[in-house]
Swiss-Prot record:
Protein name: Fe-S cluster assembly protein dre2
Motif (Cx2C motif 1): 263-266
GO BP term, example: iron-sulfur cluster assembly
This protein's GO CC annotations: mitochondrial intermembrane space
Localization terms from the record: Cytoplasm; Mitochondrion intermembrane space
Cofactor: [2Fe-2S] cluster; [4Fe-4S] cluster
Molecular function, one GO term: metal ion binding
UniProt xrefs under PANTHER family: ANAMORSIN
Keyword Ion transport listed: no
Stretches for region Fe-S binding site B: 263-277
Primary site of residence: cytoplasm
Amino acid sequence: MAKQTLLLSPPSLSSQPGKLNETLQSYNRNATDLQMLDRLALGLASLPDSAYSSIVILAGGDNSFSESLKLINRQIFNQIIGSLRRGGYIYGQDAVSGIAFDHNEAILAGLIHVGNGKYQKPDIKEMQAVPLRLGRKNDHLAGAPSLQESAAEHPCPPETMISASTMNSNEASDDELINEDNLLDDSELSAPIIQRGPAPECRPKAGKRRRACKDCTCGLAQKLQEEDAVKRADADEQLDAMRLLHDDLAEVDFTVQGKVGSCGNCSLGDAFRCEGCPFIGLPAFQPGEEVRLLNNDVQL
């Protein structure tokens, strides 16, 4: 079968006709096919099965394989390997440094790394079924004794009868009864019982707050004091977060010409005032105009 070579070109190389023609001059055009990687990636072109003895991945317009690595995914790589003959080679363009495709993908596809960036598709011949002819009698088994003869020469030992009483005695010896009263001595039995948690009489009833006795000894009073201290600390922390310092307060005098609030539109009316504006509810006024309140009526 004649050798056939496949050249895979990225789109950046095909956009430079002069450089592409210079690359094609290094190969025999009568035994070379050219295919675009972007057309394979988009599914616009397909490759024949087991048609090429060698596949060469060309470098892009920048003399690197970065564009080829982006286009050759696992699906496209398996399609390329399917068009390679058994014993064929796939590699990147000569005199170009870099990796044309992923090494792990090549190994997973069943290729063998032969060096210098070349990978070979193993030439595995098709498996053929080979019948096995087994004779009825083998020479090395001809002199072997039969089963009946071996049984006669080596008889089995006589059977031993085991009575039920013997079995019961063995079980009784294995499982001895233990007196539970002997597990604890007098000192352990007389030790006080320590209750964990509040005593039953100190437990609150449903819907009522827990209250400790005046002479509480079960630890409920101490537990309630710790809970109150935690609540008080949380309340003080929240109060400190809401407290404003002197530097946080800003006083704005609206009776002086040119003085405005933070939004700068307080004098235009409620539609232009923020939520915390002190002039909410007052009519619009001129900046610098004196505002007076007389009998809850606004006097401008």
